[in-house]
Structures are given as C-alpha cells and as structure tokens.
C-alpha cells in the first residue's frame, strides 16, 4: 500500500481511500464493522484477526458496496446497545445472537473511548480525504 507512505496515513485511512475513492478491493474495518465481525464469530477478535477476516470476505470488484453495507449494518442494526437482531440479515448465522456475553466488548478496539475531535488525527484524516 503506497498510500501508507504518506505522513499521518495509517492502514485504516489507506484502505478507506482505496475502497471508497478508487473503488479498489480493500477491506475497511471501523468500529461498526469490527463489532459485526466479533458478534458474528461469537468471540473477541484482535485488530489483526478482524482485519484478516475482513480481507477474506471482500467480494472482488464490489468492495465499495460491501464495506458500506457492513458499516451501515453495524451502525443501524448491530448497535453497541440494544442491537436489532430480529431484523439482521446475518441473524441465522450469528454465533452471538442469544449466546450471552457480548464478544465485541473489548474486541478489536471497539470499546475504546474516543479523544476530542478538534485537533485530532481523525480531523486531520478528514481534511486529507477531502483534498483527495
């Protein structure tokens, strides 16, 4: 990933640019996607594990839609509190549904509190993406 050579651009930003700006096959793992994968697998996942799993599941030539759908699934149905399991398209294969303790808690960094936005790396990445 040559985009990683840019100062301040890490794996997530590089993958997001590849998938959303250039529509290249790249798995993007944000908080919502990490939660979906951890719950679906029914276990805690390290950041490396969730990225490797996501990399194996991106459909060739359709990563833009795939990543967007997973982000939306995590934001709208597979929410941190009160998930909408009854309406989830993955409910039939979800290892977590009704199994008890939520494996997403503490998994792949999905539970970390975020620092203030103003002056953050997130703000800088947003400015960089707008310029691309």
Language model feature labels by segment:
Residues 1-123, 131:
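Catalytic cores of DNA base-excision repair glycosylases
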């Amino acid at each position: 990933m040559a985009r990683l050579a840019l100062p301040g651009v890490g794996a997530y930003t590089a993958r997001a640019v590849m998938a959303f700006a250039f529509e290249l096959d790249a798995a993007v793992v944000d908080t919502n996607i990490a939660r979906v994968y951890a719950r679906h697998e029914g276990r805690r996942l390290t950041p490396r594990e969730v990225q490797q799993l996501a990399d194996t599941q991106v459909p060739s030539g359709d990563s833009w839609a795939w990543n967007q759908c997973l982000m939306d699934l995590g934001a709208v149905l597979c929410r941190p509190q009160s998930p909408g399991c009854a309406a989830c398209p993955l409910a039939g294969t979800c290892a977590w549904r009704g199994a008890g303790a939520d494996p997403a808690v503490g998994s792949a960094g999905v539970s970390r509190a975020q620092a203030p936005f103003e002056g953050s790396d997130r703000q800088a990445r947003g400015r960089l993406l707008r310029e691309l």
